[in-house]
Amino acid sequence: MEWEDEAFVLSARVHGETGAIVELLTQERGKFVAHVSGAASRRMKPFLQAGAKVIARYRARMSDQMGAATLEPMGEGPSSLFDEPLALSGLSAAASVAAGALPEREAHPGAFHALEALIAALAIPAIWPAVYVRFEAGLLQDLGFGLDLSKCAATGSLDDLVYVSPRTGRAVSRAAGQPYHDKLLPLPPFMLSAQGGLVEGDVKAGLDITGHFLEQFVFHPLNRPLPPARVWLLDRLGEAGRL
């Protein structure tokens, strides 16, 4: 089995004296795990960080066995964010969520492009937390658990959508949801439209929505909690006054 594809590094852990086991999110083939030789070298370390974009060349004797990969860097990778610890926290959370949520060897191009869009936005402090929420919503969509924010689940109304049902992931209008206000999730306007501006509390509301459904539909069935890096991101955004 051999292939070549663009990929993002999701994680890398030391294996032996000089190698590493690397999780990759590829553009066309989904998540793959591979052994990378020489990973301890000074040349290799920068593009084995989470979020680094590479050309991966993969080879395995048997299709059901873990193979070996060589990696060639594309661009400068996450090193440009080393002076932005909050953005690095966002990148770490995104890589951890993708690594934990995506099955191996199953194509998920939507997840690849959602991560690509987030990484491009991380250099813009004013917008990336909202783009992170959209990344998680896109991941849910690609896994078959997409939110339906197009109309009110109760009335079919297209207007004044301000809640999400925590059971179904469908939008609910203000009028229909008011009697159940305490049982519904607040829906921030930016999740409905790219033109929706951000006000205080919007990012927290968005992360609460995507976190709820990631837990309910993805991680709980796998008997796993949300990744610690994702929990820490919420804490750090709060400390920075960015929620």
Swiss-Prot record:
Protein's UniProt name: DNA repair protein RecO
Top-level division of the source organism's lineage: Bacteria
Family statement drawn from the similarity comment of this UniProt entry: Belongs to the RecO family.
Matches recorded under NCBIfam families: reco
Pfam families: RecO_C (PF02565), RecO_N (PF11967)
GO annotation, biological process: DNA recombination; double-strand break repair
Record function comment: Involved in DNA repair and RecF pathway recombination.
Family annotation (SUPFAM superfamilies): ArfGap/RecO-like zinc finger (SSF57863), Nucleic acid-binding proteins (SSF50249)
Keyword DNA repair attached: yes
GO cellular component: bacterial nucleoid
Keywords noted in UniProt: DNA damage, DNA recombination, DNA repair
